[in-house]
UniProtKB/Swiss-Prot annotation:
This is R-spondin-2. It comes from Homo sapiens (Human). Changing R69C: In HHRRD; loss of LGR5-, RNF43- and ZNRF3-binding; decreased ability to amplify WNT3A signaling. Residues 204-243 are annotated as: Disordered. Residues 204-224 have a biased composition (Basic residues). The gene is RSPO2.
Length: 243
């Protein structure tokens, strides 16, 4: 009788060990299937169809979309256009909300802009704001060359003279207040000139040079010829009308 009871106990123990081993084998095979699937890399829980649903502590959960399909991934760093947002329950990749931003530090602070845009104080611009210049090496807006206000227009002159000519040039200038941070950044023009009419064409008490007299005489002669031709044309027209 005792032998029968002992045999029965051995059978029960063997069955329990077998069930335990089978359960461990199933869990090991399930874990192995996670590891073998590239989608499940770094996951705490994963499925073949939906990918990761929970990530390991230091990784970021990213929901990747491919056409109509979407699946979860666990990444060490977030892809372009996203930033890593850490939270007690699970770290996630959140989308950058800044226009034309390629990578960002937070939802409202960009660290790198898309191609063709310049970074300035966490935002992206196609042209740098006033007072800043584009630095092509880093695609950032840096402090440019700062200049002061324009001066008043100077005296109209020509050949260092303020009389003796009909037309001259007048100039105005401005000063560089702050030099740019890079020598490659050019400053805007600090002097400009424009054509002006002299207030005194003839210098007081001055004598005209022979060249100036000759030029004036030629001009008078040309006007007299033009006037004579005009009068002759009128005379011919009147004569024809009378005939």
């Amino acid at each position: 009788m005792q032998f029968r009871l002992f045999s029965f106990a051995l059978i029960i123990l063997n069955c329990m060990d077998y069930s335990h081993c089978q359960g461990n084998r199933w869990r090991r095979s399930k874990r192995a299937s996670y590891v073998s699937n590239p989608i499940c890399k770094g996951c705490l829980s994963c499925s073949k169809d939906n990918g990761c649903s929970r990530c390991q502590q230091k990784l970021f959960f990213f929901l990747r979309r491919e056409g109509m399909r979407q699946y979860g991934e666990c990444l060490h760093s977030c892809p372009s256009g996203y930033y890593g947002h850490r939270a007690p329950d699970m770290n996630r990749c959140a989308r950058c909300r800044i226009e034309n931003c390629d990578s960002c530090f937070s939802k409202d602070f960009c660290t790198k802009c898309k191609v063709g845009f310049y970074l300035h104080r966490g935002r992206c611009f196609d042209e740098c704001p006033d007072g800043f210049a584009p630095l092509e090496e880093t695609m950032e807006c840096v402090e440019g060359c700062e200049v002061g206000h324009w001066s008043e227009w100077g005296t109209c002159s020509r050949n260092n003279r303020t009389c003796g000519f009909k037309w001259g040039l007048e100039t105005r200038t401005r000063q560089i207040v702050k030099k740019p941070v890079k020598d490659t950044i050019l400053c805007p023009t600090i002097a400009e000139s424009r054509r002006c009419k002299m207030t005194m064409r003839h210098c007081p008490g001055g004598k005209r040079t022979p060249k100036a007299k000759e030029k004036r005489n030629k001009k008078k002669k040309r006007k007299l010829i033009e006037r004579a031709q005009e009068q002759h044309s009128v005379f011919l027209a009147t004569d024809r009308a009378n005939q």
